[in-house]
């Protein structure tokens, strides 16, 4: 829990070493946070960028994620062409997205897939400023 000037928020993260096989679901994580901290605004650090609908249904305020490396290959005015698992034209490839009261910020990141070179997709580090 972070606190500043009497305002509190939860900063939580998803443990995701082997993907969905061994990580908590967004619902499980949201239930644990609510039980421990009540209904505080929550910033979720989540590796996977393709679950915005689930994050929003759980009531997370802000989700910071990556995973798709910006779509690996990018074209101007089109965006990412190839996503995780070979998904063609991933929707949440880079940028800011809204669903209900949830804001998801997706970074293109610094790394690359082991078997693919990044084309038209410069590495990216984001600075996110929170304002009340």
Predicted regions and their residues:
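Soluble catalytic domains of enzymes that build or remodel membrane lipids, polysaccharides, and related
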Residues: 1-132
